[in-house]
């Protein structure tokens, strides 16, 4: 089933969880892992995926995407092959298809397990 993603992000490398992410979290929510994107960060929390997307020339305008795990209907993961550099996560929600490409060295199975744990326990 091939569909055009409504959103697409590329995670470049794992990074420390930014200290300012605490302001985005609700009571009882914890940041679990963070990854650099080309311009900002994606944070996997105990309740959702948060992606901060810096925009414009200066990067001062920031759009924040929040994808609650409870809204993920189906997902798939694809590991990098011999000639492929990137692995990939595909998530399907009621809003549409979201694609997350993973840079070399990012453990797609770890993220798959994290999403599985969060989605299945959020139901």
Where are these regions (language model features)?
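Phosphoinositide-binding peripheral membrane targeting modules
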Residues: 24-41, 45-97
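Short, exposed beta-strand-loop hairpins at the edges of beta-sheets
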Residues: 101-103
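IQ-motif-like calmodulin-binding regions
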Residues: 119
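C-terminal output/interaction extensions
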Residues: 112-115
């Amino acid at each position: 089933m091939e569909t055009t993603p409504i959103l697409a992000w590329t995670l470049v490398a794992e990074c420390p969880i930014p200290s300012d992410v605490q302001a985005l979290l609700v009571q009882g929510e914890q940041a679990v892992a963070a990854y650099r994107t080309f311009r900002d960060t994606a944070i996997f929390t105990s309740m959702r995926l948060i992606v901060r997307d810096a925009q414009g020339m200066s990067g001062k305008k920031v759009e924040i995407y929040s994808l609650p795990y409870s809204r993920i209907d189906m997902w798939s993961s694809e590991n990098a092959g011999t000639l492929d550099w990137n692995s990939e996560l595909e998530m399907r929600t009621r809003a549409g298809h979201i694609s997350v490409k993973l840079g070399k060295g990012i453990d797609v199975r770890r993220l798959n397990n994290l999403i599985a744990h969060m989605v299945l326990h959020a139901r």
